[in-house]
Amino acid sequence: MLDMKFIRENLETVADMLKRRGTEAPLDEFKELDEKRREIIQEVEQLKHKRNVVSSKIGELKRAGEDASDIIAEMKEVSATIKKYDEELRGIEERLQQVVLSIPNMPHDSVPVGEDEDDNVEVRRWGEPRKFDFEFKPHWDLGEALDILDFERGSKVSGARFTFLKGAGARLERSLISFMIDHHTQNGYTEIFPPFMVNSDSCIGTGQLPKFAGDMFKVEGTDYYLIPTAEVPVTNLYRDEILNAEDLPVYHVAYSACFRAEAGAHGRDTRGIIRQHQFNKVELVKFVHPDKSFEELEKLTRNAEEILQMLELPYRVVTLCTGDLTFSSAKTYDIEVWMPAYDTYREISSCSNFKDFQARRAGIRFRPEPGAKAEYVHTLNGSGLAIGRTVAAIMENYQNEDGSITVPEVLRPYMGMDVIKP
């Protein structure tokens, strides 16, 4: 959430930001509501001052034995007017809050201006895509032939975009989760195992609500939402709290199942496990001093990259342009892994700096020193990594001519095998 004072004083700047993002927000309504709110507050303050002054006068008249009935009647009218204004003010402030919550974050100056993913800027590459000397297969064909992915039964039991992982496929998924968490905890992240359902306040805190309610699964008749990412519960771990400056930075890593409606993905990635309603992910979340957040973003991205390097999977890093930037982010790097069946790089991690956008929504602050005014922390998060897409990338990049899949060396202690065979 942007600071209301900042929006008021920089309406043109915010309007320009929305244009660069290729989106809209009701700034005219914000201006109208904000002006009306300030007028009412000023009027109420004047009425309260008048009531206080006249209340003293009523006391003087009563002590003098004089009639104060007219002034008392006038004060009742003033009190009724104040009550009416207070009710109007509550309605205005509620709507104003909704308007402010609908305005996205300001992109950092280093974010390239562009319309969509075609305007994202490549930063670096690691590894060379494998050149196959046989006709390679997509992961969905490999998985069915090896009997480690069962799409038909996933669809029967749940519906489209659900999959059973079986045998070595399930073990590969579990091994990746353990490997990733082990690596990140060695890098100073504290492991968290979060709830997979959260309330609406948590979703507002990280920016999923109110704008993206259609992308989430809500438990009917409750205030519970299935989490789209562990970012939501882990960021809200410190909601409405004040951290000590000496405790910053705070690093957390969390495994969770993730649940997404994929409302805008009709017809995209209908085969395989690239785009599922339920998938597993290891998430990295940071709470840092505002002066350090962009430095911490570089470290976070490198931490996610290390996983792909250890798995020896080719990838590239791109900076998202303004038109492709997520709602809450000030700057995002996407890490994209090479997928032979798609003949391109596909996103496997997004690493973002939200600055104080989420912290302001969630009320997460820190005290620079004892007795000092509390300030908002900066929050960051990134996938470290998406498990299903990592499984798919391993299957496609490590496949053999006989249909088997070589297990990456770093995973063999977790898997207890070198090759997944038919």
UniProtKB/Swiss-Prot annotation:
The keyword Transport does not apply. It holds the Pfam family tRNA-synt_2b. Its main location: cytoplasm. Its EC number is 6.1.1.11. InterPro entries: aa-tRNA-synt_IIb, aa-tRNA-synth_II, aa-tRNA-synth_II/BPL/LPL, Ser-tRNA-ligase_type_1, Ser-tRNA-synth_1_N, SerRS_1_N_sf, SerRS_core, tRNA-bd_arm. ATP binds at residues 260-262, 347-350. One of its GO terms (molecular function) is ATP binding. One of its GO terms (biological process) is selenocysteine biosynthetic process. It is found in: Cytoplasm. HAMAP family: Ser_tRNA_synth_type1. PANTHER family: SERINE--TRNA LIGASE, SERYL-TRNA SYNTHETASE. Consists of two distinct domains, a catalytic core and a N-terminal extension that is involved in tRNA binding. This is Serine--tRNA ligase.
